[in-house]
Amino acid sequence: MIGRIRGVILEKQPPVVLIEAGNGVGYEINMPMTCFYELPDIGQEAIIYTQFIVREDAQLLYGFNQKQERALFRELIKVNGVGPKLALAILSGMSARQFVTAIENESISSLVKLPGVGKKTAERLVVEMKDRFKGLNGDLFEQNGDIELPASASSKAPSAADIEAEASAALIALGYKPQEAAKMISRVATAGADSETLIKEALRAAI
């Protein structure tokens, strides 16, 4: 099982990052956008904690910046009706801290704003996740003591159209319909904003 990858970032196509490990192999890793935002730029080194998921039609890696975020993902996919794709969408719309707070406060109104989460799923999340937090919450937000990596350098921005298309594609991958994703991005589009900023603002506006 692949639990941790350290390597150089080759490509970033939200919510997927391609990272080359020391053996020269490139790993495609699906990441929640709340984790994706924290990645260094292309060409820089990153450490990603991973969860390997095997399906009938695919073998997928999901990645996180902290072990605790991965632990939360593992608990989420144990909830009835919540698969890896929905768990990824949930942790893209809310940070781990925000999600824990929403569950503890039984904030159904916040949870139903997440893509793919209806009222019944939100209620199920509150019921099933509250007990699971007892084993997680104590260290969920502690620093993990990993080696600090060098700060990333600025990269050259693509065209505004490319940025908006990339941001829309990321929202579609998280479960939003194409038309809905395009509208969400157009509402927050500003000159000079990169795709990660547009995605972050679009998800924030949706909550």
Curated annotation (Swiss-Prot):
InterPro entries per UniProt: DNA_helicase_Holl-junc_RuvA_I, Hlx-hairpin-Hlx_DNA-bd_motif, NA-bd_OB-fold, RuvA, RuvA_2-like, RuvA_C, RuvA_C_sf
Domain I as annotated region, ranges: 1-65
Region (Flexible linker): 144-158
Gene3D superfamilies per the UniProt record, alphabetical: 5' to 3' exonuclease, C-terminal subdomain, DNA helicase RuvA subunit, C-terminal domain, Nucleic acid-binding proteins
Localization of this protein: Cytoplasm
Listed GO MF terms: ATP binding; four-way junction DNA binding; four-way junction helicase activity
Keyword Cytoplasm: yes
Residue span of region Domain III: 159-207
GO cellular component: cytoplasm; Holliday junction helicase complex; Holliday junction resolvase complex
A Pfam match: RuvA_N
Superkingdom of origin organism: Bacteria
Entry keyword set: Cytoplasm, DNA damage, DNA recombination, DNA repair, DNA-binding
Region (Domain II): 66-143
Location, primary (coarse class): cytoplasm
GO biological process: DNA recombination; DNA repair
Domain free text: Has three domains with a flexible linker between the domains II and III and assumes an 'L' shape. Domain III is highly mobile and contacts RuvB.
Functional description taken from the UniProt entry: The RuvA-RuvB-RuvC complex processes Holliday junction (HJ) DNA during genetic recombination and DNA repair, while the RuvA-RuvB complex plays an important role in the rescue of blocked DNA replication forks via replication fork reversal (RFR). RuvA specifically binds to HJ cruciform DNA, conferring on it an open structure. The RuvB hexamer acts as an ATP-dependent pump, pulling dsDNA into and through the RuvAB complex. HJ branch migration allows RuvC to scan DNA until it finds its consensus sequence, where it cleaves and resolves the cruciform DNA.
Family, as annotated: Belongs to the RuvA family.
Complex formation: Homotetramer. Forms an RuvA(8)-RuvB(12)-Holliday junction (HJ) complex. HJ DNA is sandwiched between 2 RuvA tetramers; dsDNA enters through RuvA and exits via RuvB. An RuvB hexamer assembles on each DNA strand where it exits the tetramer. Each RuvB hexamer is contacted by two RuvA subunits (via domain III) on 2 adjacent RuvB subunits; this complex drives branch migration. In the full resolvosome a probable DNA-RuvA(4)-RuvB(12)-RuvC(2) complex forms which resolves the HJ.
Protein name: Holliday junction branch migration complex subunit RuvA
Species for this entry: Proteus mirabilis (strain HI4320)
Gene behind the chain: ruvA
